[in-house]
């Protein structure tokens, strides 16, 4: 079965009160539309057609890197009209209609829905709710067969009592779609062309409407305002938390933990409260992450420990290495096994060899640091001259005294030592002591200044 997917994303979202198109508002670091596209891709369709309208250029720009067919809906005349705009591009056997503001839909749910579709059968995703206000109602005959969908504004009081609502997500044989689209009418309370009217047409044409339901009603929850958006965010985070815990992660409090990207985890991982994982993050076995940390686009090897209030971005931390508290690893930072980065240490494009240590109050930028080298407190690599950046190279077993300024480009060779308070501008050769500071003078009879008395 070949598949085309149509995603409706033309709505304005006035209740969001935002210049940003509704479907671009984020859930877990990705736009709502981005989540829907991600799920759609996993179904391996031959085409994904995104119907856009309000904020069309913003949507195109945000998703320019995706392989999508954008279809313009100049006037928002209803869901049926929106799908009709995509008709010329549809060539597959089956069409699946999704919504750009329903980001939590599970791939497994869509697979079950698609399994219902045949030449003589549609698949319709419905949801049973205690309060289905706003949802179109699923009307069934005495035998339980779906006969129609009635929109809430057009429903009678008896129909409004029905608890089964229409999610809007449906799959159908493409060969029938063009005929049904041509027969749609806008004779309703909204004056719009409802996609849901194809259900009654299908029944009249002798097709069966087979229904499927999501395991969790939140899968089909949309977001029309900021409150609903926050509800989607929290539900997504709790769902991701459950997934990680099932894989061997201990979360101190799943309600105070956020995933905003793609996370791969090992076993016996411990994550404390208020931790944010962004982008592509790989966490191997036995890693411990303290509270209030952000980990972005990074790899944490087995046994890594990250202490409280640390920010790790674009970094690789080797087996048994540690960072923090209050450490910052910026893009290009690599810690080999058992390397240590302590409190108030910042790394940028720096490579620390096995067992190297930078314990506190240090900036290491554009630096190559050999195994077992020790960096004293207050050390700074002066890597930028206002126009270009330069590297600092330290060999193995180097000892850098406290309060050093290492003016790049500069090399401190294996086994060398620099004295505390030095400004190193030249090579310190292997085994040498580098001292670069003014000689101390003690002045006899010196008196401190006294405050001038006011008259």
Swiss-Prot record:
Its main location: cytoplasm. Pathway: Nucleotide-sugar biosynthesis; UDP-N-acetyl-alpha-D-glucosamine biosynthesis; N-acetyl-alpha-D-glucosamine 1-phosphate from alpha-D-glucosamine 6-phosphate (route II): step 2/2; Nucleotide-sugar biosynthesis; UDP-N-acetyl-alpha-D-glucosamine biosynthesis; UDP-N-acetyl-alpha-D-glucosamine from N-acetyl-alpha-D-glucosamine 1-phosphate: step 1/1; Bacterial outer membrane biogenesis; LPS lipid A biosynthesis. Mg(2+) binds at residues 101, 224. Residues 248-455 are annotated as: N-acetyltransferase. It catalyses: alpha-D-glucosamine 1-phosphate + acetyl-CoA = N-acetyl-alpha-D-glucosamine 1-phosphate + CoA + H(+); N-acetyl-alpha-D-glucosamine 1-phosphate + UTP + H(+) = UDP-N-acetyl-alpha-D-glucosamine + diphosphate. One of its GO terms (cellular component) is cytoplasm. It holds the Pfam family Hexapep_2. Residues 1-226 are annotated as: Pyrophosphorylase. Acetyl-CoA binds at residues 377, 383-384, 402, 420, 437. The active site is at residue 360. It comes from the Bacteria. NCBIfam families: glmU. Homotrimer. This is Bifunctional protein GlmU. It comes from Pseudomonas entomophila (strain L48). The gene is glmU.
């Amino acid at each position: 079965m070949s598949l085309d997917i149509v995603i409706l994303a033309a709505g304005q979202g006035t209740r969001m009160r935002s210049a940003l198109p509704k479907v671009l508002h984020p859930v877990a670091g990705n736009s709502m539309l981005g989540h829907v596209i991600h799920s759609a891709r996993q179904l391996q369709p031959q085409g994904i057609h995104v119907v856009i309208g309000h904020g069309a250029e913003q949507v195109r720009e945000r998703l320019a890197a995706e392989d999508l067919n954008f279809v313009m809906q100049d006037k928002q005349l209803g869901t049926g009209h929106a799908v009709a705009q995509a008709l010329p591009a549809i060539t597959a056997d089956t069409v699946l209609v999704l919504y750009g503001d329903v980001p939590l839909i599970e791939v497994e749910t869509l697979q079950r829905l698609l399994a219902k579709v045949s030449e003589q059968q549609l698949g319709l995703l419905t949801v049973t709710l205690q309060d289905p206000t706003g949802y179109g109602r699923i009307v069934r005959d005495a035998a339980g067969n779906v006969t129609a969908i009635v929109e809430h504004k057009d429903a009678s009081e008896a129909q409004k009592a029905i608890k089964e609502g229409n999610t809007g997500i449906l799959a159908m044989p493409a060969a029938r779609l063009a005929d049904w689209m041509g027969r749609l009418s806008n004779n309703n309370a909204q004056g719009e062309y409802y996609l849901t009217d194809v259900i009654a047409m299908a029944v009249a044409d002798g097709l069966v409407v087979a229904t499927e339901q999501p395991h969790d009603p939140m899968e089909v929850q949309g977001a029309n305002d900021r409150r609903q958006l926050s509800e989607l965010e929290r539900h997504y985070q709790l769902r991701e938390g459950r997934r990680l815990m099932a894989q061997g992660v201990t979360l101190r409090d799943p309600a105070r933990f956020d995933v905003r990207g793609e996370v791969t985890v090992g076993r016996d991982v411990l994550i404390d409260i208020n931790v944010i994982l962004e982008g592509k993050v790989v966490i191997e076995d036995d890693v411990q992450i303290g509270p209030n940390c952000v980990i972005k686009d990074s790899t944490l090897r087995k046994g890594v420990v990250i202490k409280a209030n640390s920010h790790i971005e674009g970094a690789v931390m080797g087996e048994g290495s540690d960072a923090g508290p209050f450490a910052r690893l910026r893009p290009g930072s690599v810690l080999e096994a058992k390397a240590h980065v302590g409190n108030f240490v910042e790394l940028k494009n720096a490579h620390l060899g096995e067992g190297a240590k930078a314990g506190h109050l240090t900036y290491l930028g554009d630096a190559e640091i050999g195994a077992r080298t020790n960096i004293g407190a207050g050390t700074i690599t002066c890597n930028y001259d206002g126009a270009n950046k330069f590297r600092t190279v330290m060999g193995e077993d180097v000892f850098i005294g406290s309060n050093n300024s290492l003016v790049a480009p500069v090399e401190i060779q294996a086994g060398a030592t620099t004295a505390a308070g030095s400004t190193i501008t030249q090579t310190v050769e292997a085994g040498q002591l580098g001292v670069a500071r003014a000689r101390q003078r003690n002045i006899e009879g010196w008196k401190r200044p006294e405050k001038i008395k006011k008259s």
